[in-house]
Amino acid sequence: MNERTPARVAFVGGGNMAGALIGGLVRSGHDAAALVVVEPAEAQRERLAREFGVQAQPAADERLAACGTVVWAVKPQLFAEAAAPCARFVGGALQLSVMAGVRCATIAAASGGARIVRSMPNTPALIGQGIAGLYAEPAVSEGERAAAAALFAPTGQVLWVAREADLDAVTALSGSGPAYVFYFLEAMMQAAA
């Protein structure tokens, strides 16, 4: 485990991207018992607990308050619903988002936090070969930036951008780029057959 990786991390949402981050942390030596996942779907909770040994629970509670970092990993359209019961526990935490299109101002308004890092990892992150664009709000310290980068490092490369709007360009390139490569390779294989 990287010494800059946050010790206790809560994930709100337990889907594919949360699984990629959790898997990367556990594989790099992070203590699975220090990871808390709030996921309403029972099958997802059971999978994460079985696969990684994390604490997976159906709803937010005081265990989130013990985490210095929270990762918002829900579908963007479900963020407001997910944030409401979590806000009283996570306002003082460093908050990271892997939600496409949800701006830092929206996260701050819903969670009460100001230290927010927004990210846009791409699908190859699921196999540790991704690229994650990260943007940090001004309230995020250099140490917190390093902690955020350390959390994403096991999933691939980390690229910091200066403006939140720049994440859209990173998303267009890193998010769509692999799909075009896979499509191109598939077409080449079909042509060769």
Residue ranges and their predicted role:
Residues 42, 52, 60-134, 138:
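Rossmann-like NAD(P)(H) cofactor-binding subdomain of soluble oxidoreductases
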Residues 106-115, 131-169, 182-193:
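Internal alpha-helical scaffold of NAD(P)-dependent oxidoreductase catalytic cores
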Residues 173:
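Catalytic, metal-anchored helix/loop core of enzyme active sites in primary metabolism
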